[in-house]
Amino acid sequence: MSEAEYLGGRLLLAMPGMGDPRFDHAVIAMCVHDEHGALGIGVGHVREGITLHGLLEDVGIDPGLAPDMPVLNGGPVETARGFVLHSDDWGGEGSVTVNGLCCLSASLDILRAIAEGRGPSRFVIALGYAGWGGGQLEGEMRRHGWYAAQGRPEILFETPTGRRWTQAWKREGIDPAHLVGQTGSA
């Protein structure tokens, strides 16, 4: 793939019938994608039983001014590792800009900043990530497992979690009710 074809900054949308129940109706914010592999954070499903306040308390941070919002299921890899996708109005050590979609931070500094009311204006927090080895994601896309939608910050930050998959399809001009779970060949 050429650099222009890599998917960093895009939203991966799981196709119906992709065959992996962990990714049913998944929306993955693609953070890194190159010849060595890919890493994305799931933003389409809530991690049951944990909120931001609980997460902050678990890592020894007083929730303070942080909203008590749901924590997302970022993916099946390193499910105890936290990630914050956020607006570019906050930057700390290790923050990475993701091609116009958002910034990615994974340090306790951003959690402290959020709790103290000096964090980014918009953010989502997830535990875990989705990862692919070199060429693996491309193979899954050839088998019609994923659709690469435009990375739209309004889908990430303004659309309710449970509606992100449907709304991302609609913003692409596709009615997801017309998608089928099987592909064919002529």
From Swiss-Prot:
Q: Entry's InterPro entries?
A: AlgH-like (IPR003774)
Q: GO cellular component annotations, sorted alphabetically?
A: cytosol
Question: Which domain of life does the UniProt lineage start with?
Answer: Bacteria
Family per UniProt? Belongs to the UPF0301 (AlgH) family.
Tell me what this protein is called. UPF0301 protein Saro_0683
Q: What's the source species for this entry? A: Novosphingobium aromaticivorans (strain ATCC 700278 / DSM 12444 / CCUG 56034 / CIP 105152 / NBRC 16084 / F199)
